Regions:
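Intrinsically disordered, low-complexity repeat tracts
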Residues: 150, 312-313, 318-342
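Domain-level signal for soluble alpha/beta catalytic cores
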Residues: 1-311, 328, 335, 349-533, ...
Length: 885
């Protein structure tokens, strides 16, 4: 039988469908853990897998979705080995009937159920270790041959991931376990599938494009989407995945929306309707299709029989659309008209991959380089070179000063931030990690890791949440031998300087030769040309009047080769008066030669003017929209500065700044920022930006002149409300929401300490119980709600996870609690939620119930008798505020 890695992306493959809902039909009780059936009822698990294989699944998942040491501290290895044996038994059984079939086994693992820092309390490295313990028990089976000739497991399926950072931890754990065991990457492909909402965002705010950028950088074999939505609701996400990805895309929707019938969870889309919708998704080009919650072997059988794919060439691989990728692009894919429904016989779509398009990403934003995209602005100010105050901040550990440098550059228009914290007298690795952590908390921009030390580079790339830029490599063999393996492991867009053992060539031809050498060496490591951005090196014209020409010629030559280029623009004007004008003019000339990106100071107005005008005149500013918007803001800025009688820049958060710290809200009703002193008070501003230290300092200052209650009502709560509304409008995302909550928490801490000292301690708004229901160990959503409720001054009684109904009722009676919040992630535990609600209504009739979680809908909540359905954390907060008025 052909190895899975040899057929991935070359022909349409079918995955299996749901597990939990099918096992419920086989007798799985509410709260019972499916993994225990691997040893308790192995014949039923074998039958489950066999039914999917017989229905047409090429790949089935092992029954190990929740197999973590935290859940099974004593029997993890036994359950995992049994799960793999059960799947292999099913495969051998179906091969007797269909000896020429292609049948593969995916080792399946889901989310660990905890939020990673800074959103939660799980450390990134602890998360990696958690996944490693699971993989260490499973992956030896990838070295053990099955009777069919393949290994007992043929790929890794990391699925139902709500957080890109956890996805990265899982992928690194898989890669490092494979390396420890000597398993080649091609022998055990890694597939990662995330959960997206209707707005195409994960819980932590990632988009399909940001996930593709990071996961492809990490070297996964396929990316995808599963769970949460039905096939029609998934359509925008699937289209965007297929547009962005150059690896195969997997699609596994739910069978619509869940509801409870006779105590069991069922879904509202029948098999025939499910397949009709899947045919529409197939037009976008996913090469792996299956089902998730609510789907059964019947669904997979009908899916396979009605999606017959002719041809199996590499051209069928899902990839970027025929038009180059652009950030924010929402055009239909080439070959697919909007709303197209495919015929029953489908041929894989052919995608014209554009190798000259590179990208970097943060958790929530992707930036594309090259092609029709605008030259990218990389902010240079987080760098101690020539900056006395910055050096002092590094020596003193003044992280807030450094973070403000990043925030100012983002507001001024930077799209990527360079991060260099190298000073001989400090621990650069420790400082780099601290700055990276804090910057990623307060800015949406991708970062460029700028260091000459390999250990600092590796630590930073490992910690970074996204796909970063890496500054830098050069043509020296020793440097390439050191840097390329690190970048290959973690991913990144690598800046490559055109210098080698002989120094910096004066002429363009020799610089181009070094670039070609770097490309060739990178290819040996499997690093694509689109992941290399050549820096032709801008030299000072004050010492060589022809230096600018040599650099521009190199930019043009690399561009004509289909390569990407970046420059530290300001070097060209070193030693000259009025440097900003020389630098801006050189910037324009280089953009005309094909420059992809510039490391520059976005606070210099001439540079921004040059960039705006170039985009306008080169056809990169459709309908002149960006230029007109900017010119209006620029006019206001000049009027303000003129009225002050001098130059300078406007302060952070002022109305005339060019952009907000988060993306625009896409045309929805604007959110008015809190009032007080300027556009925002210092405290509100600190909360909005998630600055804990600043929030505490601003609160202490306010307490000198202002009553505590006034601070809460006029500064603190307005800041939280502002972030909450932007979260609801999808212009801020969960990381920013939780960082704002942490900043508010530090402010509340100062207020409480002051009130205790003065004997004025106030009572909380009310008591609220929260719990994850019996049988469910996932508490991510519950913990998010807890953080927000506490910051709105509620006393939260957290009963934890896997909580029996009787325990909830007892706690409610004890404190006569008015509101109980219940959470569930898995469909198999909704029955326990219904049981808890019924018991609460009977024993505690005064209490209201609020429910939430990945499987919940308004209809579902109504069916099980809940008083309120919280679609997200802020929805729950608003309900609590209304209830406790």
């Amino acid at each position: 039988m052909t190895k899975l890695g040899d057929v991935l992306g070359k022909e349409l493959l079918f995955f299996d469908g749901g597990t939990g809902t099918v096992l419920q039909g086989m007798g799985l009780k509410p709260g019972e853990l499916p993994e225990t059936w691997n040893t308790k009822y192995p014949d039923r698990i074998v039958q489950l897998h066999y039914n999917y294989f017989a229905a047409g699944s090429n790949i089935v998942n092992t029954n190990t979705f929740g197999a973590f040491i935290t859940k099974f501290p004593l029997e993890l290895e036994r359950f995992i080995k049994a799960a793999i044996e059960n799947a292999n038994t099913a495969r051998e059984k179906v091969l007797v009937e269909h000896p020429d079939g292609k049948y593969y086994i995916a080792f399946d693992i889901g989310s660990c159920g905890k939020l990673l820092k800074p959103m939660g309390d799980l450390d990134f490295e602890d998360c990696v270790k958690l996944f490693k313990k699971t993989f260490a028990a499973a992956f030896p089976q990838a070295l053990e041959p099955a009777p069919c000739g393949l290994a007992k497991i043929n790929c890794v399926m990391i699925e139902t991931m709500n957080d890109g950072y956890e996805s990265k931890a899982a992928v690194l754990a898989a890669k490092e376990t494979m390396e420890d065991l000597g398993i080649a990457a091609e022998d055990l492909p890694i597939i990662v599938s995330n959960v997206y909402d209707k707005e195409c965002r994960t819980l932590s705010g990632s988009t399909p494009e940001t996930m593709v950028a990071m996961l492809e950088g990490l070297g996964v074999s396929a990316v995808g989407v599963n769970c949460s939505l039905g096939p029609l609701e998934m359509k925008p996400t699937v289209e965007r995945l297929c547009r962005a990805a150059t690896v195969p895309v997997l699609v596994k929707p739910n069978a619509g929306l869940p509801k409870v019938v006779d105590g069991r969870t069922v879904f509202d889309v029948e098999a025939a309707d499910f397949v009709d919708a899947m045919k529409e998704l197939a037009a976008f080009g996913p090469m792996i299709m299956g089902g998730c919650c609510g789907t059964t072997p019947e669904y997979i059988k009908e899916l396979g029989s009605r999606l017959e794919v002719s041809g199996s060439s590499q051209a069928g691989r899902c990839g970027a659309a025929s038009e180059p990728r652009r950030e924010g692009s929402e055009r239909p894919l080439a070959g697919c008209s909007e709303g197209e429904t495919s015929p029953s016989s489908l041929k894989p779509k052919t995608y014209n991959l554009k190798p000259n398009i590179g990208c970097v990403s943060s958790n929530t934003k992707v930036v594309y380089f090259g092609g029709p995209n605008r030259p990218v602005l990389i902010g240079e100010r987080i760098n101690p070179t020539g900056k006395k105050k910055f050096k002092e901040a590094l020596r003193n550990g003044d992280i807030p000063y450094i973070i403000h440098q990043g925030m100012e550059q983002e507001e001024a228009g930077a799209q990527v931030l360079d991060v260099n914290v190298g000073l001989p007298e400090i621990d650069e690795k420790e400082m780099m990690l601290r700055v990276l952590d804090e910057l990623q908390n307060v800015t949406t921009l991708p970062l460029q890791i700028d260091t000459t030390k390999p250990d600092v580079l590796e630590a930073a790339l490992r910690r970074y949440n996204g796909k970063p830029m890496v500054n830098s490599v050069n043509g020296k063999q020793e440097i390439m031998d050191t840097v390329f393996p690190i970048v290959k492991k973690y991913g990144g867009l690598l800046v490559a300087l055109t210098l080698d053992e002989d120094g910096i060539p004066e002429d363009s031809a020799h610089r181009v030769a070094i670039a070609k050498k770097i490309y060739a060496e990178a290819e040996k490591y499997g690093i694509k040309k689109s992941d290399i951005i050549i820096d032709p090196l801008a030299m000072a014209v004050s010492s060589d009047s022809k230096a600018g020409i040599a650099t521009m010629e190199t930019v043009r030559a690399i561009h004509e080769m289909g390569g990407l280029t970046s420059l530290g623009i300001s070097n060209v004007s070193f030693g000259l008066p009025l440097r900003e004008f020389v630098t801006a003019s050189f910037f324009t000339l280089c953009m005309g030669a094909g420059l992809s990106a510039a490391i520059m100071n976005p606070l210099q107005g001439e540079m921004i003017k040059a960039w705006k005008c170039y985009n306008l005149l080169s056809g990169r500013d459709e309908n002149c929209t960006d230029y007109i918007e900017w010119s209006t803001v620029e006019g206001t800025r000049l009027e303000v500065l003129g009225s002050r009688g001098g130059g300078g820049s406007l302060p952070l958060g002022s109305a005339a700044n060019a952009s907000s710290p988060t993306p625009s809200n896409g045309g929805s009703t604007p959110v008015t920022p809190p009032e007080n002193s300027g556009s925002q008070s210092a405290l509100s501003n600190a909360i909005i930006h998630g600055l804990k230290t600043d929030a505490a300092a601003a609160t202490r200052e306010l307490l000198k002149t202002t009553e505590s209650l006034t601070i809460i009502n006029e500064h603190l709560i307005p800041g939280l409300d502002y972030v909450g509304k932007r979260f609801e409008q999808k212009t801020m995302y969960l990381p920013q929401l939780l960082m704002a909550a942490e900043a508010a928490k530090s402010a509340f801490g100062e207020i409480r300490e002051y009130m205790e000292k003065s004997g004025k301690k106030g009572a909380p708004k009310g008591k609220i119980i929260i719990a994850t229901v019996k049988g469910d160990i996932h508490d991510i959503g519950k913990n998010i709600v807890k953080v927000l409720l506490e910051n709105y001054d509620f006393e939260v009684i957290d009963l934890g996870k896997d909580v029996p109904p009787e325990v909830v009722v007892e706690a409610c009676k004890k404190d006569h609690v008015m509101l109980v919040g219940l959470s569930a992630l898995m469909t198999t535990t909704v029955a326990a939620m219904e049981e808890t609600i019924k018991l609460l209504h009977k024993e505690c009739p005064w209490a209201k119930t609020c429910v939430g979680g990945a499987v919940m809908t308004q209809e579902y909540a109504d069916q099980i008798g809940a008083d309120f359905y919280g679609k997200d954390a802020m929805d729950t907060v608003r309900y609590a505020l209304e209830l406790f008025k």
